[in-house]
């Protein structure tokens, strides 16, 4: 089961890298940023598609998008001098609270009980 969480972590990391490279490509010369963006976003979806085999889709998607938005915002402030207003901080705090609620409200699926088949004689 841990491998699926690792895959989800890789999906998040590649999404963050891909999205940040999109911004980098828009402010720099050349096509390197766009190529990196294409590769990273593609990998992100591939990793996510494997992760949802064992992780609930709602949880996986909330973590993928939510953690991605959180880190993309923080890295945008650090790397691209974007502003971080009080409203953005409130939004990020609400986002984290929502992720925690979604994760904590998810139950593990029960294993199906074995059916005893009493064939007619």
Swiss-Prot record:
Pfam family, one: Multi_Drug_Res
Gene Ontology, cellular component aspect: plasma membrane
Membrane topology: Multi-pass membrane protein
Entry keyword annotation includes Nucleotide-binding: no
GO biological process: glycine betaine transport
Keywords: Cell inner membrane, Cell membrane, Membrane, Transmembrane, Transmembrane helix, Transport
Topology feature Periplasmic, residues: 23-31, 76-81
Residue ranges crossing the lipid bilayer per the database entry: 2-22, 32-52, 55-75, 82-102
Xref: Gene3D superfamilies: 1.10.3730.20
Keyword match Manganese: no
Taxonomic superkingdom: Bacteria
Molecular function as annotated in GO: amino-acid betaine transmembrane transporter activity; antiporter activity; choline transmembrane transporter activity; spermidine transmembrane transporter activity
UniProt record similarity statement: Belongs to the drug/metabolite transporter (DMT) superfamily. Small multidrug resistance (SMR) (TC 2.A.7.1) family. MdtJ subfamily.
Subunit: Forms a complex with MdtI.
The name this protein goes by in its record: Spermidine export protein MdtJ
